[in-house]
Amino acid sequence: MLAGLAGLGGCSVLPQTPYVQRREWPLDVRRPTTAVAPKQGRVLLVRSVRAGPGLGDRGLRWLLPDGSVHVDFYEQWAVPPAEAVEDDTRRWLADSGLFSAVVATGSRLTAEYVLEGELLTFVADRNAGVARVALALVLIDQRPNPIKVLLQKTETAEVKLANNDPPAMAEAMRAAIAEVLRRSEADIAAAIR
C-alpha cells in the first residue's frame, strides 16, 4: 500500500505550465550627434516628466482590435517610461549645445529656464502598424518678474512597426521618442532665441 501511495506523488491534477522569462527593454534614446555646449551661458532645469493617466506601469502597451489596451506582464520597460523619457530629454538637450548645462531638480546651479513635461501617449497600435508617442512640454523663463512661459506644446510622433512582435514594438517606441525629442529640441531652440 505504501508503494502505491509513493507512486501517486508524481501524479498531479494541475497542468504543467512552462516558465516564461520576463524581458525588460531599455528605453535609452540618445541624440545622434553631440554639439559643443557654451562654457558661459544659459542653464536649463528639467523637472520630472509626469506619466499621463494609465502610463505609470512598465509593461509594454499595445492596442487590441476592439480598442482596448493590453499591458503585457512579460514584456516590459526596464524603468517606467516617464522616468526614462525624463532622463532621455535631459541627455538629449545636454547634447544639443543649446545650454551650458542641463540639470535635474536638486541641482545647486541657478537655472534661467525650466522645462516641465507629461508623457501623454505611449502605445503601439498593431492594427495601424505604428507606435505612437505624445509628450506635452512647457518651457518657462524664470529670469523676468513675473515668470514668462516661452513654449507650451504637445509633440507627437508615429513610427511604423516592422512587425507586431514585442522587439519590433520596443524599437518603434524608441524611434518615436527620438523623433519627439528632435522636434522638441527645435521648438526649444526657437523659443529661447
Question: Residue spans of the language-model regions?
Answer:
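Extracytoplasmic
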Residues: 39-44, 57, 72, 110-117, ...
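N-terminal export leaders
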Residues: 1-2
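A structural "domain/chain start" motif
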Residues: 12-81, 191-193
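Amphipathic beta-strand/beta-sheet edge segments enriched in Tyr/Trp
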Residues: 123-159
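A short, hydrophobic beta-strand-centered structural micro-motif
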Residues: 43-47, 88, 103-125
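Short secondary-structure boundary motifs at beta->alpha junctions and helix caps
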Residues: 68-76, 144-183
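C-terminal motif of bacterial Sec signal peptides marking the signal peptidase cleavage site
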Residues: 7-10
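Extracytoplasmic/secreted envelope proteins and their assembly/folding machinery
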Residues: 82, 86, 90, 96, ...
